[in-house]
């Protein structure tokens, strides 16, 4: 569960290392985001000469959460970190590589590019 002020790792090579959630998109008073939800983030830590710099405000999709994802068979898939992938205005990833596993819940029409770039889909 990701909410406002949550710090997330960035799971791509966009140049950002850490981002902070500043808004959960989708509804006027929506409080939590889970895997596959789009959030508005601010870049808090970035590498030199990356595509993004500290202070940039961007959209991101949540790809891993410590809280985990509940599957229809009752199993829960949990991760060691909260991670997101940065998106451009067209909801496409701005990076060319994705680091770490992502879940099958991202396999909708919107995020197939992220699933295809990921090294492992759980």
UniProtKB/Swiss-Prot annotation:
Alphabetic keyword roster: Ribonucleoprotein, Ribosomal protein, RNA-binding, rRNA-binding
InterPro entries, per the entry: Ribosomal_uL14, Ribosomal_uL14_bac-type, Ribosomal_uL14_CS, Ribosomal_uL14_sf
SUPFAM superfamilies: Ribosomal protein L14
GO-annotated molecular function: large ribosomal subunit rRNA binding; structural constituent of ribosome
One Pfam family it belongs to: Ribosomal_L14
A GO BP entry: translation
Cellular component per GO, a single term: cytosolic large ribosomal subunit
Family affiliation: Belongs to the universal ribosomal protein uL14 family.
Role this protein plays: Binds to 23S rRNA. Forms part of two intersubunit bridges in the 70S ribosome.
Quaternary data: Part of the 50S ribosomal subunit. Forms a cluster with proteins L3 and L19. In the 70S ribosome, L14 and L19 interact and together make contacts with the 16S rRNA in bridges B5 and B8.
HAMAP family per the UniProt record, alphabetical: Ribosomal_uL14
Protein name per its UniProtKB record: Large ribosomal subunit protein uL14
Gene that encodes the chain: rplN
């Amino acid at each position: 569960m990701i909410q406002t002020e949550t710090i997330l790792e960035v799971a791509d090579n966009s140049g950002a290392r850490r981002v902070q959630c500043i808004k959960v998109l989708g509804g006027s008073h929506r409080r939590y985001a889970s895997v596959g939800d789009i959030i508005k983030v601010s870049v808090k830590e970035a590498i030199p000469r990356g595509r993004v710099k500290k202070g940039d405000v961007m959209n991101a999709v949540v790809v891993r959460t410590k809280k985990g994802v509940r599957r229809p068979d009752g199993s829960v898939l949990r991760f060691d970190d909260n991670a997101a992938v940065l998106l451009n205005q067209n909801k496409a990833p701005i990076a060319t590589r994705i680091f770490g596993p992502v879940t099958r819940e991202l396999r909708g029409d919107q995020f197939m590019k992220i699933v295809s770039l990921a090294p492992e889909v759980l």
